[in-house]
C-alpha cells in the first residue's frame, strides 16, 4: 500500500479511502478542500498505483492501514470517509476493530453480496474497457443497477480509474468485492457511522439494510435523485462541506 499525506501535521488526522478501480489522485483532487481543516491520509490500495504489486485482499489492505495508524497516530484518528469500495474497506476495519477511526462516513457503500459469477462478468467488462477503451453493450444493465449511466460513468467514475491495474488485480478485486459478507463481529464496535447514498443506488440501499442489522450507532441519509458517486463527483464542494460538518 502507498500512503499519501497532505495538510498541516497539527490538524486532526482523517482517513480517505478511494473506490473500486479508482486512482487515489482523483479522490485527493475532489477532497482537497478538506486540507484546510485536517491532515489527510489517503492510501492507494495494492494494485492501483505505479510500481505496486497485485491486489491481495481486503483483510490484508485493512492490516496495512491498521499498522500505519498505530505507527504514525498511536492507533487513533479523528475520522474516516470511504466512497463506494472505500465504504467496504471501512466495514472491514470496523469489524476488525483494531484502530479507533473516530467518526466514520460511508458514501455509497457496497457490501451486498453479488456472487462469483457477477464478479467474473463485471471484471471481464472492466478489463475490456481497460484494455480497449470500450465497454460491452450490456454494461448498461449494470449501470442501471448501480444508479448511473454510461454517460455519467464517463464524466466521473471511468475518468478517475487507474488504468494500469493488471488483469490479475482486477479479477481479485472484483471477486473480493462481490463475495464480501458483513460479519456479525462489527456489532462490537461502538463507532458512530454515517451511511450516505443516493435514492438511485439500489445496491447501496441494500448494503445499508445489511449494516443496520449490526451497527449499534449509525444514522442514514438517502439523498433524493442521486446515483452512485454523484454527490462526491458532481457536488464536490457540498460534499466537502458536509464531511467537515459531520467530522467537526
Question: Across the structure, where does each feature detected by a protein language model lie?
Answer:
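Conserved HGGG/HGGXW glycine-rich cap/lid loop of the alpha/beta-hydrolase fold
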Residues: 4-50
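Conserved alpha/beta-hydrolase catalytic His-Asp/Glu region
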Residues: 115-117, 133-187
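Gly/Ala-rich beta-loop-alpha elbow adjacent to hydrolase catalytic centers
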Residues: 82-90
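Acidic catalytic loop of the alpha/beta-hydrolase fold
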Residues: 199-204, 229
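Catalytic histidine-centered segment of alpha/beta-hydrolase-like enzymes
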Residues: 226-236
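Short beta-strand/loop motif that positions the catalytic acidic residue
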Residues: 189, 195-197
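Active-site loop/oxyanion-hole signature of alpha/beta-hydrolase fold enzymes
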Residues: 41-79
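Flexible "cap/lid" loop of the alpha/beta hydrolase fold
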Residues: 95-96, 101-132
